[in-house]
Amino acid sequence: MLTNIRQITVNEYHQMAEMGIFHPEERLELISGQIIKMAAKGTAHEAAITRTQRMLNQRLGDKVLIRTQSPIKLDDYSEPEPDIAVVKTNVLDYEDHHPQPSEVFLVIEIADSSLKYDREVKTLAYAKSGIIDYWVLDINGRKLYVYRLP
């Protein structure tokens, strides 16, 4: 990362969204203070999310909450929207805040065009925040990469 880049905080990112700076259809996430444009969702990507979510729901039931493409707040400068996050149940279903690392059991990214980014940049961001289990499902290579206990 360049030293002269001004990082944006999660609060500033939310304020920018509330002011309408981003187009409502833009798929963005905040990683290490930088606004990252996410790739368009392809059919194979969406199908993999659906199958993975279904399998997790069947095996875990109501013991956890399975969120798809919803924000998790890693720290003051990162709020990614992983394809799947398995989080602790919450009485308000996280109405008052996005899940934080201590509330996250597992994060899964489904990678088709984003494999390098998911395996390098996001792995580091999740590890730095204390996410204990991070998986990258490479749908093109048909591989699962597991990153555990950073």
Task: Annotate the PLM regions.
Residues 1-150:
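Gly/Pro/Ser/Thr-rich low-complexity, intrinsically disordered segments predominantly at protein N-termini
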